[in-house]
């Protein structure tokens, strides 16, 4: 296998690893946001600062995941 293909394979593996890490973090944030937005809690007692920070991070993660997904598809197409 030539060095360029090995490098491409390494980039693909790294991108997939990063995607899985972000996916795990996003899943954790969804659970956290659901817990913070407890529908049985009085609205005055909700910690909206934590909710805001968590939702903001979730948005950043989803944008990173979309970018990584496009990169992964591009790298996989180069193997064909």
Regions found by a protein language model. Give the residues of each.
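Short, charge/polar-rich alpha-helical segments
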Residues: 1-24, 56
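Long amphipathic alpha-helical coiled-coil segments
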Residues: 32-35, 39, 64-80
